[in-house]
Amino acid sequence: MTTAFPSQVRQNYHQDSEAAINRQINLELHASYVYLSMSFYFDRDDVALKNFAKYFLHQSHEEREHAEKLMKLQNQRGGRIFLQDIKKPDQDDWENGLKAMECALHLEKNVNESLLELHKLATDKNDPHLCDFLETHYLNEQVKAIKELGDHVTNLRRMGAPESGMAEYLFDKHTLGECDES
């Protein structure tokens, strides 16, 4: 058994920020888990919307990378990583593309709200490094993700989803399929 030594690099890093980073890591991993569930739902033979599956798998990987980036920050700042149980997705059956996109939009808004609270904490604790880190790597990306998902929800509704299965098929093929090509 090794004894943990106090950090030699910790400077201007409040314990509340350290704890909040650990909570954010958990939330990012939860988001990754939800997107992974969505991806493999759309990959099922009775759903067969391969571009929805690819889209959500990409989102899952992105959320995991966000968690890893926060873990790296925690180590760089002299904090300690304390992983917690990852909450399972609220559902296993995502019903249709519109419902999944609506759930994803809600999820991203929750992640964004948590990041904004973390930024406020960093500001209150006079931690410009953490503020800059969040602004550089997370906040703008969240706004873009929320806008993209909002657009997807709008377009699916405009096309007649979920009542029209053809709408989902065309959205999968043309909208999400185009994302894959670029």
Curated annotation (Swiss-Prot):
PROSITE patterns linked to this entry: FERRITIN_1, FERRITIN_2, FERRITIN_LIKE
Protein task: Stores iron in a soluble, non-toxic, readily available form. Important for iron homeostasis. Has ferroxidase activity. Iron is taken up in the ferrous form and deposited as ferric hydroxides after oxidation. Also plays a role in delivery of iron to cells. Mediates iron uptake in capsule cells of the developing kidney. Delivery to lysosomes is mediated by the cargo receptor NCOA4 for autophagic degradation and release of iron.
Binding site for Fe cation 2: E63, E108, Q142
Main localization category: cytoplasm
Keyword set, alphabetical order: Acetylation, Cytoplasm, Cytoplasmic vesicle, Iron, Iron storage, Lysosome, Metal-binding, Oxidoreductase
Residue pairs linked by disulfide bridges in the UniProt entry: none
Originating species: Equus caballus
Protein name: Ferritin heavy chain
Gene Ontology, cellular component aspect: autophagosome; cytoplasm; cytoplasmic vesicle; lysosome
Reaction catalyzed: 4 Fe(2+) + O2 + 4 H(+) = 4 Fe(3+) + 2 H2O
Family statement drawn from the similarity comment of this UniProt entry: Belongs to the ferritin family.
InterPro entries to which the protein is assigned, alphabetical: Ferritin, Ferritin-like, Ferritin-like_diiron, Ferritin-like_SF, Ferritin_CS, Ferritin_DPS_dom
Localization: Cytoplasm; Lysosome; Cytoplasmic vesicle, Autophagosome
Gene that this polypeptide is encoded by: FTH1
The keyword Oxidoreductase is assigned to this record: yes
Subunit structure: Oligomer of 24 subunits. There are two types of subunits: L (light) chain and H (heavy) chain. The major chain can be light or heavy, depending on the species and tissue type. The functional molecule forms a roughly spherical shell with a diameter of 12 nm and contains a central cavity into which the insoluble mineral iron core is deposited. Interacts with NCOA4; NCOA4 promotes targeting of the iron-binding ferritin complex to autolysosomes following starvation or iron depletion.
Phylogenetic placement of the source organism: Eukaryota, Metazoa, Chordata, Craniata, Vertebrata
GO MF: ferric iron binding; ferrous iron binding; ferroxidase activity
Sequence positions that bind Fe cation 1: E28, E63, H66
